[in-house]
A protein has these predicted regions:
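Short recognition patches in nucleic-acid-associated and regulatory proteins
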Residues: 13-27
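Alpha-helix initiation/capping motif
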Residues: 21, 31, 79-80, 89-90, ...
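Short, basic interhelical loop/turn and adjoining N-cap
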Residues: 54, 85-99
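Repeat-unit-sized solenoid/scaffold elements
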Residues: 73-91, 112-123
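Short Lys/Arg-enriched helix C-cap and helix-to-coil transition segments
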Residues: 99-127
Length: 127
């Protein structure tokens, strides 16, 4: 338990939640950007991100994270250094993240890197 307020409702007794699940992108296990403080209600209740009816909140958190990545990665092509300056992950985690991607002469294509970070998919607003 952490002493940060819940980033969704402001509640107390927060727990750290991986926005992109570890099974979807192991490279982000220790990435601070991928962690969010949630109170037990927003984390584990039926309407929390892990709850039966929590899909909407989970989708919103993922979309917010993706939008943050789109702002932080503001160039069309990204080098390993630029990616690691943002993610701050280990060299081996970075290597594992980028292994499936094709490196162009200029670097890795921005949208491919973001898709890889997001667990292999991009999220859109639900109306």
């Amino acid at each position: 338990m952490y002493f940060r307020p819940c980033e969704v409702c402001g509640g107390v007794g927060s727990e750290l939640h991986h926005i992109i699940r570890r099974s979807h992108c192991r490279a982000l296990i220790h990435c601070e950007l991928n962690l969010i403080a949630l109170c037990p209600k927003c984390h584990r209740s039926s309407k929390g991100v892990h709850g039966k009816h929590g899909h909407e909140l989970d989708h919103k958190l993922k979309l917010d994270f993706q939008n943050k990545l789109e702002m932080l990665f503001d160039k069309e092509y990204l080098t390993e250094e630029i990616i690691n300056d943002v993610l701050k992950i280990s060299d081996s985690a970075l290597k594992g993240l980028l292994k499936p991607l094709k490196r162009e002469k200029e670097g890795y294509e921005r949208i491919s890197v973001i898709r890889q970070i997001m667990g292999g998919r991009l999220y859109e607003w639900k109306y």
